[in-house]
Amino acid sequence: GVKTSLQGQTNLKNLYAIGETSCTGLHGANRMASNSLLECVVFAKSSAEDIKLNFDYESADIDEWDNSKVITAGENIIIAHNWDATRRLMWDYVGVVRSNDRLNMAKENLKLIYEEVESFYRNFELTSDFIELRNLVLVAKIIIESALARKESRGLHYNIDFPDLNKSAVPSIISK
């Protein structure tokens, strides 16, 4: 999730994250799917109060997007294929029960998808579907790197190569 303050504020001015998106530390590694009601309700109220008091409504000066040098790709099949390949890769290799061998295979396979997506990102017209795909691939990359960095099993994240919980508290892995 996205690291936030207790008001849901991220490190980007005026950008808040609440619920499934946020990383607040309320539930730790054992928060199961659809169990973020506490974060949704509490942080929504806290964020709303913070926005009401502190939100800067001035918009930033942003240069117009220059797409004169980009090519219209018209390659929806590439988006669909890479989306499906990333989804299957994460399901098959980076599920709840993991091994370092599968994580490393996932990392290598995702590298090919990432390189193709980045090539399109630099040279072709962007669509919302393509931007979602790029974000999906980047998040998958961060998840794999974080799973490889953790040398223990904690909560619902189980690595058969490191089946035991490290008794000393290990801070959350934060990736930039």
Positions of PLM-derived features:
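Glycine- and aromatic-enriched mobile tails/lids
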Residues: 2-17, 21-176
